[in-house]
Curated annotation (Swiss-Prot):
The gene is gltX1. This is Glutamate--tRNA ligase 1. NCBIfam families: gltX_bact (TIGR00464). The lineage of its organism: Bacteria, Pseudomonadati, Campylobacterota, Epsilonproteobacteria, Campylobacterales. ATP binds at residue 239. PANTHER family: GLUTAMATE--TRNA LIGASE (PTHR43311), GLUTAMATE--TRNA LIGASE, MITOCHONDRIAL-RELATED (PTHR43311:SF2). PROSITE patterns: AA_TRNA_LIGASE_I. It comes from Wolinella succinogenes (strain ATCC 29543 / DSM 1740 / CCUG 13145 / JCM 31913 / LMG 7466 / NCTC 11488 / FDC 602W).
Amino acid sequence: MIVTRFAPSPTGNLHIGGLRTALFSYLYARKTGGKFLLRIEDTDLARNSHDATKAIIEAFDWVGLSYDGEAIYQSERFPLYKEYIDRLIQEGKAYYCYMSKEELDALREEQRSRGETPRYDNRYRDFTGTPPSGVAPVVRIKAPLEGYIEFEDGVKGEMKIGAKEMDDYIIARSDGTPTYNFVVSIDDALMGVTDVIRGDDHLTNTPKQIIVYQALGFPIPKFYHVPMILNPEGRKLSKRDGAMGVMDYKRAGYLPEAVLNFLVRLGWSHGDQEIFSMEEMLRFFDPKDLNSSASAYNQEKFLWLNHHYITQTPNERLEELLLEFGCQPLSLGVREILYPALKERAKTLAELAQMLQEIVQTPSELDTKMLEKVGNSENGEILENYALFLESLESAGENPKILEEETQAFLDIHGLKSGKLFQSVRLALLGKGGGPGIFEIMAAIGKEESMARIQKASEIFKNRN
């Protein structure tokens, strides 16, 4: 059975790179009927944040990545790690090192002066003498002295690291706390993890972890090291490129479907297909198709995907989502008029909410540039006549089509072109240019409110000359 895991450190917000590897791990486990596990790597007690841990769980809930069983917290497993450290010492596979920081710094400086790569010289590897007093030892694991550490990476291919490149690295600090590569290896083994999908910034950790697996006789999982997400210029991704924490995307008005669809295509593909439902991701995903080259973050593509999913979202669900952006529920009739028009224009829920607020709220002022363009006494008279015309209508109600037909009759009677009227009406209704069609707006806010806004703008227009 395939068992994958996601193992974030709660020292900050969960970012999209982390969520991407979680998604890949989730898809592989679910596709094969396996298990997807969550482990919180909170051994850095000084930097851990309860809020960051909470945000990780919230992000999983938001995007719908369910994990099996309970989340595992490394901070609760220190006694377990100590058992395995003691076992390695007893079996002669790890040892106490009494080298002081000053001695280690001096050794490294000497090695650099000779043009060598700084590394521990194994001086306490087979030490049997009397330990120096006043030194709290660290524990080092015995790395192989010759040969190679080899593994087949599912993305990078065959990896081969010479023993001479490795040293006896520390698995327990002088205060007794275990180090990252040791606890990761213990947890992956005890959790039964068969496949590890993670960023290729972890590639150098893999041989260190394999040393632990081999020392304890644990099976070695299959590794997939995915290239990092870069910005469009090929550099490290940052907030300046539009990248944010996962929950920041929710607050900015992105849909979880869009986030997952965007991330799955950063490092994996299935032909030329761009739009993937979760069902399609599960059907097509295979880790052997993960790309070996880095993917670039494209904000415009992200917004395009988000717009697509907004247009596909049922109006009822959309209204629920917009409550978080300060929008009030609309009547069924108004909702069915406005939402189709607004969905076609909005790239985010935040944009949609802003457009909706601009429609339902009477504008406090009129856009200066638009007013300079159309705000004259002639257009003021046209608006006044149009308001009177609206007042005479009985059947228009909340039907944009009837409003459009009746307005065409008004244009014909007065010999006006539609553009001359529509620009002024739009400014009157919204206080600015742009936005959805004026007939949808008028049908949504009702005849009385439409007339009031148009009459007010008419007075402003006429008083400018």
